[in-house]
Amino acid sequence: MSNLFAYSQVRRSRIVRQQQKQIKKAYEEALKEITKSVDKLYGKNDVSSSMRRVYLNKLKDDIQNQMNIVDGKTENIIKDNIGLMAEEVARNTQMYNSKIGLNAIVNSTSLKHRVVTNIITGKVYDGKFTLSSSIWGDNKRRLNEINRIIARDILQNKGVYDIAKDLERFVNPRARKDYDWSKMFPGSRRKIDYNAQRLARTMVSHAYQQAFVESTINNPFISAYKWITSGSNRVCPICIDRESTDQFGLGPGIFPKDRLPLDHPNGMCTFECVMAMNDEEIGEAIADWYLGEGDETMNDMIDRYVNDLKNF
């Protein structure tokens, strides 16, 4: 049988691409409002130090307000896409069941709720961080970077408008920040949306993996999972090792169903099912199950799988 979850893998790539555009758009909308505030400072380079402080504090507040809006949008975008990813895996599972002739209904609503909850609350990360703490923690770091840019520009005796233009460039998601930028403002990010995009990609990928495992862990026709690297030219050593090493005596890259490691941040690896039976054997097992005949242990396993899909 071909890759059972090829459909949801394709959907994951599309969700990630669409999500990237959604987050970029949120930053661009914020930039438009920030630019309005910056334009109001045109011609105000030659003001007293006290007035410079007043203008810059107002601009900083305007920027922070817009970034708060962006972060709120980003949090909602990620939540929505985690849920969408879980729904696509549920749909893929339903397609697979129909293909093998198993009349089992997948409770996509329950699966979606479970996956979204486990990821955004940090349960899947052993409580080390949550979606909200990640986003708003980065919000504080970004504000510190803004403060450092202002402080450095003041040390260079720049005027209000020139400082404002530097801040405008900092929050521009399409601005190119070269080596000179890093030299002028060490420690400030080159891409304003990088951390948000990284977090979003990571959580959608983890939603895919969690939904994949939840919907197959008790499938009696699947014996293990095989790790498949993304195939890009930037595959990390960890993923290469996971794909090529025989850690459990099952073959290179093959993991027991309860031992599949969580993909690392920004990862785009996928997983394939290792089948315990061929198509003909699966068909016979399902027929026996419908008729209440054949292997009782297998029938009990199919019962459990079907019930799990209904009651995630």
Language-model segments: which ranges?
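N-terminal leader/targeting and assembly helices and adjacent pre-domain segments
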Residues: 1-184, 277-312
